[in-house]
A protein has these predicted regions:
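Conserved glycine(s) of the Walker
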Residues: 115
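P-loop NTPase switch/communication element
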Residues: 123-176
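Conserved small/polar residues in nucleotide/adenosyl-binding loops
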Residues: 1-5, 190-192
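Short secondary-structure boundary/capping elements
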Residues: 87-90, 137, 160-164, 186-189
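Short, flexible loop segments at the rims of nucleotide/cofactor-binding pockets, characterized by
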Residues: 82-87, 156-160, 182
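Short, basic, glycine/proline-bearing loop/turn elements
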Residues: 79-82, 153-154, 178
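Conserved P-loop NTPase nucleotide-binding/switch module
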Residues: 13-16, 141, 173-193
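N-terminal "pre-motor" subdomain/linker immediately upstream of P-loop NTPase catalytic cores
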Residues: 3-111, 119
Length: 193
C-alpha cells in the first residue's frame, strides 16, 4: 500500500489497481494497528518490520512495513493456511528425491513471490509425513506452521525466539536436528558458516 494512491494487489504475478483508496491518515492508522510497540520503534529508527499475522480463522499473512517518502507503506502477502504438497505445486520429482536424501544442502533461490518459501514448506511437510526426523526451521517471519506427523518440528522465528539467523544456526548445531530450514541467507549468516 502506498499513501495517497489506490491499494494494489498482485494476482498471478501481475499488479492490479483496486478500487479501494485510503487517505494518508487511514493508511497510517491501519499500518500502526498491525505493529507492536517494538516494531513501531524500529520503523521510526528507519528499519523495516517484517512479520506474520494470523487471523482467528487460521489464515496467515506475511507483512512488510517500511517508510517511503517519509510515510508508512506496507506490502501484505496472503499465505495458504495449509501447506501445499509437492504434487499440488506441480514441482519436478527431483525435489521429492532430494527430500528423501539423508544428507545434503538444498538452496532454493529466486525473486520475491516466485515460490521459494512454498517450495521449501512443501519439502519440509513431505519429510514430516514420511520420516521420523527432527526438523528445525529458522525463519523471519515463520510463514507456514506445520502440524507434526512423523517428524518433530521446532520453528524458531528471528526477533521473537532468537536474536539472529547466525545465533539460531549456532544453537541449532546443539539441538540435534536432522533437517534445518534456513529461511534466508544474510551476510552475517554466511560469515559464520
Amino acid at each position: 500500500m502506498y499513501k495517497r494512491q489506490a491499494v494494489y494487489l498482485r494476482i498471478d504475478g501481475k499488479l492490479i489497481k483496486s478500487d479501494l483508496k485510503l487517505s494518508d491518515e487511514m493508511t497510517r492508522k491501519l499500518i500502526l494497528s498491525l505493529l507492536t510497540k517494538e516494531r513501531q520503534e524500529s520503523i521510526w529508527r528507519g528499519e523495516d518490520a517484517d512479520f506474520a499475522l494470523e487471523t482467528s480463522d487460521g489464515n496467515r499473512q506475511r507483512v512488510n512495513v517500511f517508510c517511503q517518502q517519509g510515510r508508512l507503506a506496507a506490502a501484505i502477502r496472503l499465505l495458504n493456511a495449509k501447506v501445499p504438497t509437492l504434487s499440488q505445486l506441480h514441482l519436478p520429482p527431483v525435489l521429492q528425491n532430494l527430500a528423501n536424501e539423508p544428507r545434503g544442502l538444498i538452496l532454493v533461490t529466486g525473486p520475491t513471490g516466485s515460490g521459494k518459501s512454498t517450495t521449501l514448506a512443501a519439502m519440509v511437510d513431505y519429510i514430516n509425513h514420511t520420516r521420523a526426523d527432527h526438523i528445525l526451521t529458522i525463519e523471519d517471519p515463520i510463514e507456514y506452521v506445520y502440524e507434526q506427523d512423523q517428524a518433530v518440528i521446532h520453528q524458531r522465528e528471528v526477533g521473537k525466539d532468537v536474536c539472529s539467523f547466525a545465533g539460531a544456526l549456532r544453537s541449532a548445531l546443539r539441538e540435534d536436528p536432522d533437517v534445518i530450514l534456513v529461511g534466508e541467507m544474510r551476510l552475517s549468516l554466511i560469515h559464520i558458516s
